[in-house]
């Protein structure tokens, strides 16, 4: 069993995090979850959910550990804590900006900082449009520092029939990037 950190910041698209966590759990991985206060508000607004745990079965919760964003004393804040990858999904531009300047003032930002300094996979799924120059410069800076910028772009070539198809394709692509098998992962094949 491998350990993954999933951070949820205050950007729209929290369903992507929920789907990713479910897929990681289905693959029997341990998932450490950190949710920002704005992320909790978005969770309620977009999914109508008061409690993060209510989104998962009792069996799934055995693999999920939720951490307070203020728990800077968490083992996750140390480079000695083994983590396969950190994924911040969705990732607000506030979080992008903070990470890009090394501001590690809460557990979510510290875990991202640790991923960069330890040269571990850090995947950021920024949810903002349009992007202005400062957004782009911050994302470029993070990319140059080793982060993978994974914007939630629709994959029209799979001919999605619903928004859920688009969500699943993105989550499947993240899982494929992490080399985690999933039924959500699709591979392009030329229809000719």
From Swiss-Prot:
Residues reported in the UniProt entry to bind dimethylallyl phosphate: 157, 173
Signal sequence segment: none
One Pfam family linked to the record: Flavoprotein
Homology family: Belongs to the UbiX/PAD1 family.
UniProt-listed InterPro entries: Flavin_trans-like, Flavoprotein, UbiX-like
Reported function: Flavin prenyltransferase that catalyzes the synthesis of the prenylated FMN cofactor (prenyl-FMN) for 4-hydroxy-3-polyprenylbenzoic acid decarboxylase UbiD. The prenyltransferase is metal-independent and links a dimethylallyl moiety from dimethylallyl monophosphate (DMAP) to the flavin N5 and C6 atoms of FMN.
Catalytic function, reaction form: dimethylallyl phosphate + FMNH2 = prenylated FMNH2 + phosphate
Molecular functions (GO terms): flavin prenyltransferase activity
Protein name, per record: Flavin prenyltransferase UbiX
SUPFAM superfamilies: Homo-oligomeric flavin-containing Cys decarboxylases, HFCD
Annotated binding of FMN, by residue: 10-12, 36, 92-95, 127
Principal EC category: transferase
Keywords: Flavoprotein, FMN, Prenyltransferase, Transferase
UniProt EC number: 2.5.1.129
């Amino acid at each position: 069993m491998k350990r993954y950190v999933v951070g949820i910041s205050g950007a729209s698209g929290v369903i992507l995090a929920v789907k990713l966590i479910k897929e990681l759990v289905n693959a029997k991985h341990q998932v450490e979850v950190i949710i920002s206060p704005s992320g909790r508000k978005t969770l309620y607004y977009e999914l109508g959910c008061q409690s993060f745990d209510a989104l998962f079965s009792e069996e799934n919760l055995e693999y999920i550990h939720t951490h307070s964003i203020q728990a800077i004393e968490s083992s996750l804040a140390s480079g000695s804590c083994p983590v396969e990858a950190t994924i911040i999904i969705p990732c607000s531009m506030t979080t992008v900006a903070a990470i890009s300047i090394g501001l590690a003032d809460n557990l979510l930002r510290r875990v991202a900082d640790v991923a960069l300094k330890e040269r571990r996979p850090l995947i950021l799924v920024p949810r903002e449009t349009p992007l202005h120059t400062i957004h782009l410069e911050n994302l470029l800076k993070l990319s140059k520092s080793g982060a993978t910028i994974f914007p939630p772009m629709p994959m029209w070539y799979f001919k999605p029939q619903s928004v859920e198809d688009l969500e699943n394709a993105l989550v499947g692509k993240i899982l494929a990037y992490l080399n985690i098998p999933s039924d959500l992962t699709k591979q392009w094949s030329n229809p000719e």
